[in-house]
Amino acid sequence: MRLFTVSVLLPLISAALARHFTEPPPDALVVKPGSSVAGHFSSLGEAVNSLPADESSQVVFVYPGTYIGQVNVSRPGPVKIIGYTKNSFDFTQNTVTLVHNASLASGAGSDDLTGTLRVLSSNVSLFNLDIRNDFGVAVSNGQAIALSGQGDQMGVYACRLFSYQDTLYTNVGNHVFLKSYIEGAVDYIFGRHSIAYFEGNTIASKGSGCITASGRQLNDTGIYVFNNNKIIAANDAFPNVTGNVFLGRPWGDFARVVFKNTFIPAPLNKTIWSIWNPGDERIDSILFAEYNSLGSGVADAQRANFSTVLTRDQAAQYTLASILPNYRDWVDVDYLH
């Protein structure tokens, strides 16, 4: 009998578990540049705008390409937007890129209106999309959102989000971000009212600044929980990233952010967490907490006195099930493994 070593079996197991999106599901709308097939769309925006304004479930399948322009999802019924990929669990295999260029400095009018992809309705799921706001750096008013989440039960799976300031606006509703890549520098995961859960993601700092800016204004259920993520310096990070990255600062007086089981090779500031601004600290009623942070980025940490290191029992209170009890009704749980 032939024996297989673990090193041989693991790739076979991984291949067996891999899922691919290379053909449109039945009844899906299709986005495919240059296609002459009747009913195909040349842009994602056109496809989304053509969806019926009813409660039906709809799927949009996007073939490889770079698609320019803002996309707004606002219909009442559930929507899945699926990007072509040969491995749906690996964001490095993504082939679909959405690009927009807007910021407050360019006159967009609000944070949300700068977004490349604006999710304005509930029950929207995004798979294997690269979403970019290419505005870049500004001296002021540089808010330039890649993904704006304004609806309930938004799931983001193996997507990549790119900007510099305010990359991800997780603002209203219950949101999950699984096996994705989120890149930015200044307050690049932020919002006011959402409950947001992050697992299996790579979070990449491009320059100095804070990763999160929780804008929680009341003592309500809003929270960001990060579990089993990795924090790195982006491949093209600016030199000022070293020693100038923080896990978060409090945009709102009741900011609440928990990081659990985080691997951090990124060169964080030794205090790990930041006040909002000198003279406007906003730290009296916040929860900035960690459990089991590992890696060179926290090796010499001298944590701020307004932060909390959780015990094992305390950390166990912050799980996907505890903050989103009905998650199995809407989350694609395959991305939790």
Predicted regions and their residues:
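Fungal secretory targeting signals
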Residues: M1-H20
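Sequence-level preference for short, compositionally simple segments enriched
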Residues: R19-H337
